[in-house]
Each structure stands twice: as structure tokens, then as C-alpha cells.
Swiss-Prot record:
Protein name in UniProt: Renin-1
Locations listed in the record: Secreted; Membrane
Organism: Mus musculus
Annotated catalysed reactions: Cleavage of Leu-|-Xaa bond in angiotensinogen to generate angiotensin I
Active site: D102, D287
Keyword Hydrolase found: yes
Length: 402
């Protein structure tokens, strides 16, 4: 395959990508190993990049609907903070790509060899080459997803896609325009949306729906485990069931509150013993593609006030690291049960930071109606609570991770 080589300056700039374990197959369900890598934000923080200036110049890298799309994808994932990636194959023979498994979207896309050399980010990622695949079929329809001030743009193609040992024929995006930020520093190549068909740009049937149509899974569910440790073995996605080795007790299920979205209703947010928000109910999406917990700005300010946190710069609230052991718990009422995060769950400590400040893994995100306002429970929450997404019963299950 004629893949683009990473320029020498890029090799010096970036850390080397990590090698992924191959998926292992069982008789009842499929496992996709995940690895945890430094997020783009962490890389920039360690290099002393001013995130305030970066945000002003490049915008917030949160996906929003394509202006040319007739559907309305949920506006969720902030890929600037994403850390967990798995491996899939596209084509015959398979071409390997590292992707985010993202419940906040429904499309699969990867960079293409047809990406212009003007887009430097394409040069450091694995690129799909259709001529190397005997199972490729041309589609050619335009494909666009907007990200703040940038966009991911290309065209649709069809080929065999292998996920966790299961192969389906899939329409996906070949990306030919890839923004420099955040993808120049991102360790993942593309995104595999695990959302519902109504969220898909271009009316494409999502990968998981194609898998369900084969009837090969024991159950019409998938589950996500994110390791809380700092090592690279970051967790796993299980198709068709869940893995009791990674959770304790039983699942508590909450029905989805919005058709065709992994959205549920939250009936309270407490800091310490005080319920501050959402007693009348708030919409919340459980999003595997987001690293942090996101809330409307007005709600986040109340939480930060209760925690005594200060806004250091755009999208970053901090506390003195010496305060972390004394910070109160934050609890989320989901389906009549409190899911509690301690300060060690929601505070990030960067070892190389010199100002002795710790960052809170909560961000502001304001989404206008009709989609919003909405909260997002990302990896900060999922690391504590093993999560099962049940398509058959339209519900999400939570169990304490271990």
C-alpha cells in the first residue's frame, strides 16, 4: 500500500503511536481492546501551549450537524480531550485504523489517501486506500461534519469493515480534509459512531446496526469499560454482552428519554449533601467519545462555586492540588439512584505542571434548543461506572467498575 510517510519534523514533534492488541473472539460476544493515550489537551498542556489563545483561534472542537445534512446529530463529543481508542479493519485485506468508539455520533470515518497534502494532519495518520481492497465499492456522495471553526470533509465509500472479529459491509466516510487542530496531535485515526441511525450524517446505517442485522450477538447490547489506571491498557468495548470481571454487583437500568439517542433523564445533581441542580429533571447523554462531564454554563458555575474552584482560562476550572482530599463528592441522580464521584474521580493532576494547580474534569457546553440544553457524562463518569448500552430495551445500565 502506498501510505504517506510521516515527515521527520512530525516524528520529532509527536510521540510515537502505540501498537494495539488484536481483538479476541469468544463464543458469546466480541471484545475490542482499548488503549489509553495522552489526550490532545494533555499534550498541549505539557508543551506550555496557551489553551485560551488556542480556543480563540480554532474554536471549541465539538461536533455539530452538517449544514448539508437533513438529520440532526446530537452535538456532543469534544475530541480535544479524548483518550481511549480501539482498532478496526477496513477492506480486503483489512487496512488497520485506530478509532474512537463514540456513542454521541453514528458515522464511521477515516482519513483517505486522497486527502490533499495541504492537510498536514492526514500525513501522520493511517490512510484508507480503496484500490488496495478487493471488496471496495464506489459511492461518491459528499460527507461533511463540522467542528467549531473547522470541518471533516470527504466522500462516502463502501467496503468490508471488521470490528471485534465481526465483518459487515459498511458505508463510511473517506476524509479528504482534516483540520490541523486537534487531529495533528491526535493518536486516533478516525471515529466509529455507536449512536442511532437518526444521528447519522447522510442517512448511513451505523456499523452496530449492521452487526445487529446479522444476528451473531448473544444480546443486542454493547458495553464499555474504561480503566482508571494510567497505563496504556485502557479498557474494552464488548459487543453482545458485558464482562463481569470489570464490574461488581448488578446493573441498574435507566430507560432512554429521547428516541434515537443515548439520552436519559437526570433528577438531581448534588455537591456534598446539597442538591443544587436538576430536581425537575435535566437531559443527559452518556457519551463514550467525551472525556469530561459537561454541563450548561450556568449550572457549571454553581457547581464550581460550591467546590471553591476558579476559572483559570477558557474551559478550565482549577483548585490547589492540596485541596483535593477535602473536596466534596458530586452525585448524579439517575433512575432514582445516586451515582457518586469522589474528588479523586473528577480531579485531574498533571505531574509536570509547575503551578501546583489541579484541573477539574468538568466543562461548560451550551447547546441551544431543540437539542439542548443537555448534560454529558463522558469518561470521567464511565471510569467509575461500567456502562451497558441496550438497544433491544432502549436503556442504559450502570454498575460499579472494578
Amino acid at each position: 500500500m502506498d501510505r504517506r510517510r510521516m515527515p521527520l519534523w512530525a516524528l520529532l514533534l509527536l510521540w510515537s503511536p502505540c501498537t494495539f492488541s488484536l481483538p479476541t473472539r469468544t463464543a458469546t460476544f466480541e471484545r475490542i481492546p482499548l488503549k489509553k493515550m495522552p489526550s490532545v489537551r494533555e499534550i498541549l498542556e505539557e508543551r506550555g501551549v496557551d489553551m485560551t489563545r488556542l480556543s480563540a483561534e480554532w474554536g471549541v472542537f465539538t461536533k455539530r450537524p452538517s449544514l448539508t445534512n437533513l438529520t440532526s446529530p446530537v452535538v456532543l463529543t469534544n475530541y480535544l480531550n479524548t483518550q481511549y481508542y480501539g482498532e478496526i479493519g477496513i477492506g480486503t485485506p483489512p487496512q488497520t485504523f485506530k478509532v474512537i468508539f463514540d456513542t454521541g455520533s453514528a458515522n464511521l470515518w477515516v482519513p483517505s489517501t486522497k486527502c490533499s497534502r495541504l492537510y498536514l494532519a492526514c500525513g501522520i495518520h493511517s490512510l484508507y486506500e480503496s484500490s488496495d481492497s478487493s471488496s471496495y465499492m464506489e459511492n461518491g456522495s459528499d460527507f461533511t461534519i463540522h467542528y467549531g471553526s473547522g470541518r471533516v470533509k470527504g466522500f462516502l465509500s463502501q467496503d468490508s469493515v471488521t470490528v471485534g472479529g465481526i465483518t459487515v459491509t459498511q458505508t463510511f466516510g473517506e476524509v479528504t480534509e482534516l483540520p490541523l487542530i486537534p487531529f495533528m496531535l491526535a493518536k486516533f485515526d478516525g471515529v466509529l459512531g455507536m449512536g442511532f441511525p437518526a444521528q447519522a450524517v447522510g442517512g448511513v446505517t451505523p456499523v452496530f446496526d449492521h452487526i445487529l442485522s446479522q444476528g451473531v450477538l448473544k444480546e443486542e447490547v454493547f458495553s464499555v469499560y474504561y480503566n482508571r489506571g494510567s497505563h496504556l491498557l485502557g479498557g474494552e468495548v464488548v459487543l453482545g454482552g458485558s464482562d463481569p470481571q470489570h464490574y461488581q454487583g448488578n446493573f441498574h437500568y435507566v430507560s432512554i428519554s429521547k428516541t434515537d439517542s443515548w439520552q436519559i433523564t437526570m433528577k438531581g445533581v448534588s455537591v456534598g449533601s446539597s442538591t443544587l441542580l436538576c430536581e425537575e429533571g435535566c437531559a443527559v447523554v452518556v457519551d463514550t467519545g467525551s472525556s469530561f462531564i459537561s454541563a450548561p454554563t450556568s449550572s457549571l458555575k454553581l457547581i464550581m462555586q460550591a467546590l471553591g474552584a476558579k476559572e483559570k482560562r477558557i474551559e478550565e476550572y482549577v483548585v490547589n492540588c492540596s485541596q483535593v482530599p477535602t473536596l466534596p463528592d458530586i452525585s448524579f441522580d439517575l433512575g432514582g439512584r445516586a451515582y457518586t464521584l469522589s474528588s479523586t474521580d473528577y480531579v485531574l493532576q498533571y505531574p509536570n505542571r509547575r503551578d501546583k494547580l489541579c484541573t477539574l474534569a468538568l466543562h461548560a457546553m451550551d447547546i441551544p434548543p431543540p437539542t439542548g440544553p443537555v448534560w454529558v457524562l463522558g469518561a470521567t463518569f464511565i471510569r467509575k461506572f461500567y456502562t451497558e448500552f441496550d438497544r433491544h430495551n432502549n436503556r442504559i445500565g450502570f454498575a460499579l467498575a472494578r
